[in-house]
Swiss-Prot record:
GO terms for biological process: thiamine biosynthetic process; thiamine diphosphate biosynthetic process. Binds 1 Mg(2+) ion per subunit. It catalyses: 2-[(2R,5Z)-2-carboxy-4-methylthiazol-5(2H)-ylidene]ethyl phosphate + 4-amino-2-methyl-5-(diphosphooxymethyl)pyrimidine + 2 H(+) = thiamine phosphate + CO2 + diphosphate; 2-(2-carboxy-4-methylthiazol-5-yl)ethyl phosphate + 4-amino-2-methyl-5-(diphosphooxymethyl)pyrimidine + 2 H(+) = thiamine phosphate + CO2 + diphosphate; 4-methyl-5-(2-phosphooxyethyl)-thiazole + 4-amino-2-methyl-5-(diphosphooxymethyl)pyrimidine + H(+) = thiamine phosphate + diphosphate. GO terms for cellular component: cytoplasm. This is Thiamine-phosphate synthase. Gene3D superfamilies: Aldolase class I. Keywords: Magnesium, Metal-binding, Thiamine biosynthesis, Transferase. One of its GO terms (molecular function) is magnesium ion binding. 2-[(2R,5Z)-2-carboxy-4-methylthiazol-5(2H)-ylidene]ethyl phosphate binds at residues 143-145, 174, 194-195.
Amino acid sequence: MKFNSDMLKIYFVAGTQDVANKADFLPKVEEILQAGATAFQLREKGYNSIDNPAELTELAEKCHQLTQKYHVPLFIDDDVDLALAIHAEGIHVGQKDEKIESVLKRVQGSMIVGLSCNTEAQVKQANQLDGIDYLGTGTVFETTSKADAGAALGVAKLQELVELSHYPIVAIGGITLDNLPQTMATGVKGFAAISMFTQMTAVPTQMQKIKAIVKG
């Protein structure tokens, strides 16, 4: 699957640790995909996540079946071996994960590559690299979904990074329906979220509101 920045519009990120009952995870993923998510990232990380390799591979394969059903890319967070093993469409790399240069060498253009960049220095460094497709930038607003999220950037700083970047940016961190319009106004290509999706009720209605803002 070739990268298209439209993939970043409604970017769902989650792992089993993000739902109260692990049995609800795959149904929730399908519900959000069916309602119009444009990408899904399996981020199985932190307290109460799956650490058994066989179980994780099985979960990733099931997620891939769902993303293929709805014709959207599956990204694997910080696990090149897993991404390659299941032929995921993409890999997302954080600043504290495996070095991006190593990841690019390993995937050799076989998948979409996203990199977390949250400072001017990180964006400038990314601008010097070939093989990256997009940057994930945040946290834009305060969030409790990611323990390592750091201080919030705010929309003014986000816009500065968007203007600095050679690559399309997807915003993440504390994004809600209320602050989504100002987030999109910075020039980002889309937004990513965890709890906004995993805790969503009345999914079709909420997703229609999101689509209206993102396409605005």
